[in-house]
């Protein structure tokens, strides 16, 4: 398909020398999957994700995960609105077409779980109210190589993700 070739060529103008990875990420995007990019710092993980977002024209958000990132930062929260006397949903970063989840290994297992649940179910639930994620919805996760993404109970997160079939991992 010529349109697909053109898209890949535009991305490869920014992401040089990683044609195979770019093609695999594109396959995941087209299939509605998610991608984990695991590599040492400074190798273009964020640049790759942003190139995809720009070329595809998708609404994009980036979350730089830290140890104090909480689930509500990602999925959203309800706020009491004095004027109406009710609660209003304030969407989190996940309400986008392409989410760059940068340095996922730096955040708590609780926050990782909230993100993974949304990735699998394609929706978020806040205060008993369910909100669908936009379509298309793709998460590009980045992690430092050798970060050992491990849940608090010692279960290796990558094995869980692969078993769920919600992403492919590229290094």
Model-derived regions, located:
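Walker B catalytic acidic pair
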Residues: 39, 102-103, 114
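Pre-Walker A (pre-P-loop) alpha-helix and adjacent loop at the N terminus of AAA/AAA+ ATPase modules
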Residues: 1-43
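Conserved alpha-helical scaffold flanking the Walker A/P-loop in AAA+ ATPase domains
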Residues: 24-27, 80-100
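Canonical AAA+ ATPase core
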Residues: 81-86, 103-111, 119-171
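Conserved amphipathic alpha-helical interaction elements at protein-protein interfaces in regulatory
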Residues: 13, 31, 54-58, 80, ...
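Helical mechanochemical/support elements of P-loop NTPase systems and associated helical scaffolds
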Residues: 3, 7, 18-21, 44, ...
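Walker A/P-loop
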Residues: 29-66
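Residue-level preference for the first positions of well-ordered beta-strands
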Residues: 34-36, 98, 138
């Amino acid at each position: 398909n010529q349109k697909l070739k053109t898209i890949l060529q535009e991305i490869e103008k920014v992401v040089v020398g990683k044609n195979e990875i770019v093609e695999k990420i594109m396959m995941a995007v087209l299939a509605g999957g998610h991608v984990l990019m695991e590599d040492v710092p400074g190798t273009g993980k964020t640049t790759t994700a942003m190139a995809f977002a720009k070329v595809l024209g998708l609404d994009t958000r980036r979350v730089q995960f830290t140890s104090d990132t909480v689930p509500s930062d990602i999925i959203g929260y309800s706020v009491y609105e004095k004027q109406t006397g009710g609660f209003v949903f304030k969407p989190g970063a996940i309400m986008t077409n392409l989410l760059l989840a940068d340095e996922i290994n730096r955040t708590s297992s609780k926050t990782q779980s909230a993100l993974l649940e949304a990735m699998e179910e394609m929706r978020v639930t806040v205060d008993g109210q369910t909100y669908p994620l936009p379509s298309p919805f793709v998460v590009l996760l980045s992690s430092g190589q050798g970060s050992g993404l491990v849940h608090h109970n010692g279960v290796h997160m990558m094995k869980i993700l692969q078993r769920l079939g919600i992403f492919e991992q590229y290094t």
